[in-house]
Amino acid sequence: MFLEVFVDPFVYFCVSCIFVPILVDREHLTYADVIGYLTEPAMLFAAALLFIAVAEAKIARWRYRSPPLSTFYERMRARWYLLNGVVIHIFMDGLVGVFKASTLLARNYEKFDKRYGAALGNFEGSAVHVVSLMELFVKGPLCILLYRAYQTHSRHRDALEFFSCVTQAYGTVVYIGEEIISGMPHLDVDYNLEFTTHYLLYFWFAIVFGCLCYLFVPCWWGWQAYKRLVAASSHPARKGMSARAVHPPPPPPSFSFSPLKLKKTK
């Protein structure tokens, strides 16, 4: 099961998000700069949180005697939520996007969206900062809980997944919607379809592919979770109806009245 991470596309997506800034600025970086980038406190915190989340989920699965996830598709979905929670929501969009916890990553964030260059509290970056703070404090922890729910086969998994997918899709709509209705003043748009390395990385990959991915996948998986929730909620009703069909209730009591002879007593 460990080797399957090498064929998981989202693993490559997260790794590329971490290492692309090094490749882009490789001519201006020294070996010490690269080591410093990879050992920044925020980077080490994300790595430690990833390890703790996986270890705690394994312990919980052992404690609840839950079987491991049986299919590659289920394990891939669980990894999607784990990596989204730790790498994307908490580390990149939250700590880096808002608090500039990594200088190199923060510079690259500003290259594809100038709103990330604004200080926290500045009106220009207010929309992305609100979305990113939601990722840091709501969506990130929620995704980690959902990964744990997958590993333990929790009965709360579908509800957590539906809510998580709704928040992810909503955040994407708010993020890109503000730019679309205002003419995209903060994005470096490839209007002339030049497809240079800069545009491929900072527009077509970061904006177009990223927004489509975070709209399509949450809507798809959220819809599946919604259908499972509806089916689960209607199951007790169907079960109750079938039980009443097998064991019909007794007929209501019938009352018959007969005339009573009343004797007049003295």
Where in the sequence are the language-model features?
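Non-transmembrane, juxtamembrane loop and terminal tail segments
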Residues: S234-K266
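Intrinsically disordered Ser/Thr phosphorylation hotspots
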Residues: F10, C14-S16, D33, L44, ...
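Juxtamembrane "helix-exit" motif on the non-cytosolic side of transmembrane helices
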Residues: V20-Y31, A60-R63, G177-S182
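Eukaryotic polytopic
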Residues: F2-F6, A47-L49, L69-R238
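Short alpha-helical hairpin
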Residues: S16-E27, K111-L120
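Extended, low-polarity transmembrane helix blocks
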Residues: V54-P68, W223, V230
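N-terminal onset of structured domains
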Residues: Y31-E40
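First transmembrane helix
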Residues: D8-I22, P41-R63
